[in-house]
Amino acid sequence: MKVKVFDLNGQPVDEIELPKVFFTPFRPDLIRRAVIASWTHRIQPQGRDPMAGKRRVTENIGKGHGMARVERLKTPPRYAAFVPFARGGRRTHPPKVEKIIWEGINKKERRLAIMSAIAATANYDIVKARGHIIDNVPQLPLIVVDDLQKVSKTRETREIFKKLGIWDDIERAKEKTGIRAGKGKMRGRRYKKAKGPLIVVGKNEGIVFGARNHPGVDVVVVDNLGVEHLAPGTHPGRLTVWTVSAIERLKEIYG
């Protein structure tokens, strides 16, 4: 199947054979598992000091004193110590670094998940259901010439995105940016940001600098393409712009 290739003015200039990966069956279950596996591998193991709450000189006073038979400080006041329910005592079941906190996924399943997520970017209904505004997008998948990779100015990419019909989706991402509810706003996560278009290139020749300041826009080299880029939040069908060299590289990787 051949699709059109567009120039930076949004005009069709050529045609290209679509790789077989774009015809992979839709597997939202595998995509979800792959994204969660990617999430969990970034979690940092945490534990507690094995001696926390135990640095006390205590003794057991035994029975016959009308007091609970728990470890108590040797010196007055004879407060309870060491035990979990005492002030300054140890934790009952503290978190341990040995805990397995990551979710696994088989290599073939992860590969199939990425292929399925790539195919979802070419499905109009899936992209629309994800919330992207694609009324002015000429086709899916949207493939442009490699000249896009060399654009390094934000004002230039703004005009290009308008001509390609994806600027409306960038405006949507900008409008949805807001302050997070809860204490996360005090922990370096103040703003919630919507995901807009994804730009997949064969080689970065300056486009990262040209597109990074647009709200919701991400740029990735096709060799580093992961399922999280294509399905943020486990939701497949992200609006994606491909360059010709990225499509050729997809043919080499996935056929």
UniProtKB/Swiss-Prot annotation:
Kindly give the Pfam families that the UniProt entry links to this protein: Ribosomal_L4 (PF00573)
List GO terms (cellular component aspect).
Answer: ribonucleoprotein complex; ribosome
Q: Which domain of life is it from?
A: Archaea
Q: Tell me, what is one Gene Ontology molecular-function annotation carried by this entry? A: structural constituent of ribosome
Coiled-coil ranges per the record? none
Q: Which PROSITE patterns match?
A: RIBOSOMAL_L1E
Q: Which UniProt keywords apply?
A: Ribonucleoprotein, Ribosomal protein, RNA-binding, rRNA-binding
Transit peptide: present as a keyword of the record? no
Q: Which GO terms describe its biological process?
A: translation
* UniProt cross-references to NCBIfam families, sorted A to Z: rpl4p_arch
Function per UniProt: One of the primary rRNA binding proteins, this protein initially binds near the 5'-end of the 23S rRNA. It is important during the early stages of 50S assembly. It makes multiple contacts with different domains of the 23S rRNA in the assembled 50S subunit and ribosome. Forms part of the polypeptide exit tunnel.
Protein family per UniProt: Belongs to the universal ribosomal protein uL4 family.
* Subunit (UniProt): Part of the 50S ribosomal subunit.
What the entry lists under PANTHER family is as follows:
60S RIBOSOMAL PROTEIN L4
Question: Can you name this protein?
Answer: Large ribosomal subunit protein uL4
Q: Please give the organism.
A: Pyrococcus abyssi (strain GE5 / Orsay)
